[in-house]
Amino acid sequence: MKNIIKILFLALTATGFSQQIDADKSAFAHTFSIVARDAETGEMAVAVQSHWFSVGSLVSWGKSGVGVVATQSFVNPSYGPKGLALMQEGMSAEAALEQLIAEDEGKAYRQVAFLDVNGNASAYTGEKCVVYASQITGDNFSVQANMMLTDQTVPAMAEAFEKYSELPLAERMVEVLKAAQAAGGDIRGKQSAALIVVGPELVENPWEEYKINLRVDDHQNPIEELDRLLKVARAYEYMNRGDLAVEAGDMPEALKQYGTAEMMFPDSLEMKFWKAVAMANDGQLEEAKPIFKVIFEQNENWREMIGRLVKPGLLTVSESEVAEIQKL
C-alpha cells in the first residue's frame, strides 16, 4: 500500500497536482457518505464508510445548532471547521460551500457536502474525483460517493434515506450505509466507518456537542460493527437515565431504565449488576440475590464491588444485607 501511494504521489506531482493541494497532508478518504437532518427532531448527522483507516477522524464534522459537513476524496479537513464557522455566522450550506470551493486550488479533487440547521443541503464533486463519483441532494439530505465499484451506489443511498424515514436519524443513517455497500460500495473494499449526530440547538459545553459519536477505525465489516455499536450506545442511554434516577433518589425509575438497558444488551454483566443494585435499594433484595449470584459466578470482581458502593451511598441496604450479598 505504501509503495502504491508513493507512486501515486509522484505521478500527481509530475502533473502539477502538488501545486494545487498539499500532497503530503491530503488523505485518500475515497468513500461514500451522507449528511442529513431529521425533519421532526431537527437532529443532524454524518455517516461514512471507506477503505481507509479511521475515516471518521477526517470526513465527518458537526456542530449542534449549526450544521454538519462531510469532506472526502482527497480530503481538505479545513472544510469542516471553516464550513461550520460560516454556517454559524448565518450563511446557508450552499453559500458557505461555494465560498470555500472558490478559495480552494485543489477543488477539482474534492468531494464535499454541507447541511445547515434548516435542512438546506449542498454538495460538490470535483471533476478529477475518481469514478464512479457523484452526488444526490434532496430535502434534508445529501449523499455522495467517489471511487465506487458501480454507478448505482449513490442512487441506492438516496432511495434508502427515503425508505427508512420512520427510523430515528442515527439508525436511518446506518441503513443508508448498508444500502451503499449492497450496491457495490468502495471499489477497494471496506475498512472503517463513522457516525455522528448533533442536536438542533447550540450547546454551552463541549461535551454536550454530540448526541452520538461512534467510530470504527479498522474492521473487516465496519458497517456491521457500527450498527452493533449503535445498539450498544442506545442501551447505555438507558443506563445513563438510570444513573440520573439514582442520583435523584428515584429507585423505581432507575430500575425501569436499567431493566430496559439490560433487555437491549443482555450479555452485559454491568447492566445486570446495576439493575440488581437498584432492586436491592428499592427493597427487592430477595429478587436481586439470584442476579447477583449469576454475576459473581462469572466474575468475582463484582462481589468486591459490592462493598465499595456503601460509602458513596450507591448501595443503601443495611450492613448485614451487604454481607448477605457478598456471601452469595
Task: Map each language-model feature to its residues.
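Register position in tetratricopeptide repeats
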Residues: 247, 281-282, 315
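Alpha/propeptide regions of enzymes that mature by internal proteolysis
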Residues: 19-188, 195, 217-250, 259, ...
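Canonical tetratricopeptide repeat
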Residues: 274, 308-309
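Short coil turns that delineate tetratricopeptide repeat
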Residues: 266, 300-301
